[in-house]
UniProtKB/Swiss-Prot annotation:
Alphabetized NCBIfam families for the sequence: NDH_I_N, PRK05777.2-5
A single MF term (Gene Ontology): NADH:ubiquinone reductase (non-electrogenic) activity
UniProt keyword Transmembrane helix, yes or no: yes
Catalysed reaction, written as an equation: a quinone + NADH + 5 H(+)(in) = a quinol + NAD(+) + 4 H(+)(out)
Protein name: NADH-quinone oxidoreductase subunit N
GO BP terms: ATP synthesis coupled electron transport
Naturally occurring in which organism (per UniProt): Rickettsia conorii (strain ATCC VR-613 / Malish 7)
Top class in the EC scheme: translocase
Record text on subunit structure and interactions: NDH-1 is composed of 14 different subunits. Subunits NuoA, H, J, K, L, M, N constitute the membrane sector of the complex.
EC number(s) given by UniProt: 7.1.1.-
UniProt entry keywords in alphabetical sequence: Cell inner membrane, Cell membrane, Membrane, NAD, Quinone, Translocase, Transmembrane, Transmembrane helix, Transport, Ubiquinone
Mode of membrane association: Multi-pass membrane protein
Amino acid sequence: MLLLLPEITLTLIALLGQFFAVMIPNKNRIISNIIILLCILSIFLTFKYSSYEGVWYSFATGINIGISKSIVLLFTIISMIIYRDYSILVADELKFEFITLMLLSVVGIFVAISSRNFLLLFCGMELTALTSYALAGFKLNDMKSSEGALKYFILGSLVSCLSLFGISFIYGFGGSLQFEDILYKLNDNSGMNLGLIIGIILFLSSIFFKLSSVPLHFWVPDVYEGSPITSVTYFNAASKIGMVIVLLNISKLIIGNYYPINYNLIKIIAILSMLFGAFGAIRQTSLKRLMAYSTILNIGYVLIGVLLHNQEGYKAALLYMLIYAVGSIGFFTCLIILLGKDVDKASFKTIQGIAEYHKTIAAVISIVMFSMIGIPPLTGFFGKYYLFYQAINQEEFALAYCGIFTSVVAAFYYLKVVKAMYFSKKIEIIKLPMQYGLLLINYLVVGFLLLGSFIISF
């Protein structure tokens, strides 16, 4: 029962917060501050009561499950602070439903991370998916938001059906839905269980869809463009980190010498994700669509670590995802500070010459872009170096060379952002009142990207 305490606590926090937000409608900001404080305290609860030496999880990744959940919750709290300050910045009403949806989404991620059963894993991912559809369509009067959310919902429903179909295959050919039992079946020397492998592949479609990897990526640019930037920040950080942890958690089931079909399939997915993400972003003018393709590219990098099938590879994948999530939070936060209400229309034109008026913000965006390129001594360089080094060390030369090549290609559009800020024709930007929560997040992002490599080395 204590192992479920983090999930129960977050659910109660979300529901109680929503109750008081409805009963006292004019105090949403005060309620949101209290909820954020309670969530910060919940990090310690999550770490304490999720921290058991689960043989399955520790054997797969060597990372404590309590740490994993705490990381996801921390990034969710940051997303909540960004939404709170964004609503103040644009003088908009803070809708507490947004925070409730984020918290319930995290509960789904927690359930998925803790599960050792395919059906429970599916339920956790579906709770996350349903709340994500609502977050994507939160701009009720915006046609693009509604269109993106509808695409997201329809494709997500289709993938969920495939995932359930896969679970039926797994149960039919494996006789169980427990991870340990299925792993035992896959290790059985009686021959390749093709039906079981097909079931696992079908189930994986749901995870790859939520990770935005090729070929289940077509929804990403439209959803990112139409969704509120606060939703995109959550999708790109807490949600993606959670799904990466889930994928690592079941890595022993999907990759092994006894069924190379899965390995080769994921290898193709990783290479195509890197190529499509790198080249697809080149002609984009919307910064949100640019980050959508950047996400596809970086998920391809993360899959390199998964394919290495050892603890060093898993750690490299999770570390890289954390570094990318921090960078994307910094980028979106800077756009909010610069553009306010117009942030969802952010493009290269809207940031032209901003270095003249906002030197600090331009410097932060530049550091984020250089880190995403992988320029030393920024943390992004060490994340990529560690990942590619492990790939070369395991003689995965195709993955490493593809990663290096696409990093060079991606440098073009990352540097294009820097060029627009410093070398393009200047446009005057209205200075908005500073929100100290957003400013603090930016300072923390810069500190991590500049000094994170020293922290990581220890």
